[in-house]
């Protein structure tokens, strides 16, 4: 195999089961606010006191300060999204845009890590690293992806029994660009865990974003990340157990291939976004960039929490007035359905 050594039957089964588990936990967390509170607040609190001090220890790969910080930062992101979805007090302009900012910061932090590994060849934090120009290329891909984050002031809370954090301007091409970059990053930095914490983890949020609840990729991503970190801290041996581990080939050609693909795709996304901003004269700080895209319109109309006969009017006002049609003068969520 090009990217990985041949998988054993038990490894194939564990990969598939872990994917189903992550998607299932994400869907479970969407049922209502109490289930979300148990998964992202109560359970981690119990594990922090009684379990993780004994499992996330030195020599397990989960005992570093970085893993502890990463775990609680992922949980904080999931909790913030949960608060925004279920509590109107948090549905404010400058709170709703915090998750996208965190998204960008996390991308840029990973890019720095990619750059740092450029000249490294050997074991780093327990993983084989094969550094090279591909690290630089993928770091640039990540920077382009972060620059292309848009529509963060247009995030809405969906209607219906299941409440979701919906980001209509986060369309499929940005998602694929992010997935390619992130997989290349994990493959470059933690190669023998990249199947689980890269490919499987990304599939666990991309599949729901395309086939279960469109427009909620950011929510799916942060929740599956949080669940993954809970698993990592609780049973850190799982990902590197001989029966389940998926070894990278550590082939420089494989590193180069995925990094080139990530860079090329994100460069195309960047060019298309620049065309949209300058060619269509759209200001990303005042309006949605892709509001004329069929994907945007579908997500917005199926999610906006207004009566059915007012949804087209709300979309038309958002298109004409930009974010002025999405927030009131105090920065609270507002959907303009009547023209001023």
Where are these regions (language model features)?
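Juxtamembrane transmembrane-helix termini
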Residues: 87, 112, 116-119, 154-161, ...
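Hydrophobic transmembrane alpha-helical segments in integral membrane proteins
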Residues: 1-18, 134-138, 252-259
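Hydrophobic cores of alpha-helical transmembrane segments in multi-pass inner/ER membrane proteins
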Residues: 11-21, 70-86, 138-154, 202-206, ...
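An N-terminal, globular interaction/scaffold subdomain
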Residues: 2-89
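C-terminal transmembrane-bundle signature of multipass membrane proteins
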Residues: 15-23, 197-327, 331-332
């Amino acid at each position: 195999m090009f990217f990985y050594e041949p998988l054993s039957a038990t490894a194939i089964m564990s990969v598939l089961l872990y994917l189903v588990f992550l998607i299932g936990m994400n869907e479970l967390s969407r049922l209502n606010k109490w289930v979300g509170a148990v998964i992202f607040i109560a359970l981690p609190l119990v594990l922090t006191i009684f379990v993780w001090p004994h499992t996330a220890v030195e020599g397990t790969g989960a005992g570093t300060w970085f893993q502890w910080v990463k775990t609680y930062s992922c949980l904080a992101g999931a909790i913030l999204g949960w608060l925004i979805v279920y509590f109107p007090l948090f549905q404010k302009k400058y709170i709703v845009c915090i998750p996208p900012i965190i998204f960008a910061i996390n991308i840029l932090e990973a890019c720095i890590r990619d750059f740092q590994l450029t000249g490294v060849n050997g074991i780093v934090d327990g993983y084989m690293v094969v550094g090279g120009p591909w690290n630089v290329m993928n770091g640039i891909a990540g920077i382009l992806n972060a620059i292309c984050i848009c529509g963060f002031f247009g995030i809405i809370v969906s209607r219906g029994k299941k409440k979701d954090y919906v980001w209509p301007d986060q369309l499929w091409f940005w998602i694929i660009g992010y997935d390619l970059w992130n997989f290349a990053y994990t493959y470059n930095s933690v190669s023998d865990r990249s199947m689980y914490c890269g490919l499987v983890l990304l599939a666990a949020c991309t599949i729901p974003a395309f086939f279960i609840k469109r427009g909620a990729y950011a929510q799916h991503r942060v929740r599956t990340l949080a669940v993954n970190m809970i698993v990592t801290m609780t049973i850190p041996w799982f990902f590197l157990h001989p029966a389940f581990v998926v070894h990278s080939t550590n082939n420089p050609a494989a590193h180069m291939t995925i990094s080139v693909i990530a860079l090329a795709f994100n460069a195309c996304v960047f060019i298309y976004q620049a065309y949209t901003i300058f060619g269509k004269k759209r200001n990303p700080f005042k309006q949605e960039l892709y509001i004329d895209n069929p994907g945007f319109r579908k997500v917005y109309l199926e999610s906006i929490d207004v009566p059915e006969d007012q949804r087209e009017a709300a979309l038309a006002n958002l298109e004409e007035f930009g974010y002025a049609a999405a927030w009131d003068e105090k920065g609270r969520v507002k959907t303009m359905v009547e023209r001023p």
